[in-house]
Amino acid sequence: MIAIDRMTPGSPPAGFSFARTGQGSEGKWTVTEDRTAAAGKVIEQTSTDRTDYRFPLAIHENVPAANVDVEVRFKAVAGKTDQAGGIAVRLLDADNYYVARANALEDNVRFYRVVAGRREQLEGANLRVSPNEWHTLGLRAEGQRFTVSFDGKKLFSATDKTFAGAGGVALWTKSDSVTRFDQFKITVLP
C-alpha cells in the first residue's frame, strides 16, 4: 500500500511523477487532508481545466511491471464536464497504456487501451457511480487478460496484447474531474 498517511498535506505526493495525455493544462496533484479517508489524507487532482480530451496522470515511480493487481479507493468530488477516476497500468509514457476508469457523471466503468494518445474502449459496464462517495476500483493485468472490479465485485474481463511488457502504474483523471484517491495498493504478480 502506498503510504499516503506519511505524505505532507499541501505538497505533491512523494514518489510520483506527473504527466498528461491529450490537450489542456497539466494536472495539479496534491496531498489533502480528508477525515473520511482511511489514512486521513488523500492524493487529489484539483485542476478544473474543462478541456474534454485531457487526462492527468500521477505515475508511481517505483513499479515497472507487466503483471499487476492494482486497487484504489476514489471519490469523485466535483467536475462539470467529467467526474472520473481511474488506474493506468503498463504505462510506457503519457500516450501509451491501459486504463480502467469510473465516471460519476456517466454512471459507468470503462476499460481502454491508449495508443499514441488515442483511447479505444475495450470493455465496459453501466452502473451507479455515486459522486462524493468512496468507491473501490480494481484492475488486474495478467498476460493478455485484464479484469476490472468495482466496489469488490468483478465487472468484466478483456483481452489485449498491445502492451505486453512492463510499464508504470498511475492514478488517472479526466478533464475537470476533481477526484480524491485513498488506499492505493499495487501488487506485482509473478
What are these regions (language model features)?
Residues M1-A3, I43, R118-G124, L155:
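Local beta-strand/beta-hairpin segments that build beta-sheet-rich folds
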Residues V115-T136:
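Short, aromatic/His-centered strand-loop micro-motif at the edge of beta-sheets
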Residues A158-D182:
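Flexible glycan-contacting loops in extracellular carbohydrate-active proteins
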Residues A3-R6, G15, K28, N67, ...:
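Extracellular/lumenal ectodomain signal focusing on beta-strand-rich modules
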Residues P9, Q45-R110, K174:
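Secretory/extracellular carbohydrate-interaction modules
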Residues S149-K153:
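Short strand-turn-strand beta-turns centered on an Asx-Gly dipeptide
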Residues I4, V70-V72, N132-V148:
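Short tryptophan-centered beta-strand motifs in secreted/extracellular beta-sheet-rich domains
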Residues S11-E44, R50-R54:
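Extracellular glycan-recognition surfaces and repeat-rich motifs
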